[in-house]
Amino acid sequence: MMGGRARLWTDRRGSAAAEMAMVAPLLIGIMFGSLQMGKFFWDEHQVLKAVRDGARYAARQSFASMPCGGTATGETQIKNVVRYGRAVVTGSDRPLLNYWTDPATVTVTIDCYANAGVDGARIYDGVYTARSNVPRVTVTASVPYTPLASIFGFNAGLTLNASSQATVFGL
């Protein structure tokens, strides 16, 4: 009987399989976490690019459509550029992020710079020379993040936030 036990403790067959069974859950967790982190950074980058494109689109609208302290005339189109990547959206268009379904997550605000400099000189020249106030548009998005683990019922409760500003030059 003693010989059988000693043989069992010194037998190395199957030890690699046992070690793999112990380490596999850790490796799978690390791989899933890496995928999740990559998806988070990708989605954050998509939101950053979207608000930047929305601010650029808004900056190219006419001065009349961007009243200081008011609401942009084409606010719906600006929000469409942010969420869909295009100003006019059809029924078959999909948002840049498949879970970005709420247009209220995008805000467009307009404020103005006073275009008065030192000794009567203007701060801004060119298209702004005759203007006393220069409109600046800010596009902000606050998107609730949907992680990969949401298919298992887990939700991290994270929000992707981005903001971009551009001075309106009314082309």
PLM features: residue spans?
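N-terminal leader/signal peptides at the extreme start of proteins
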Residues: M1-R13
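Short, conserved structural patches
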Residues: M2-G3, E44, K49-L171
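Alpha-helical membrane and juxtamembrane elements of multi-pass inner-membrane transport
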Residues: R12-S15, I28, T76, L158
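Alpha-helical hydrophobic helix detector
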Residues: A16-Q36
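A cross-family signal for key residues in well-ordered alpha-helices
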Residues: A24, K39, L48
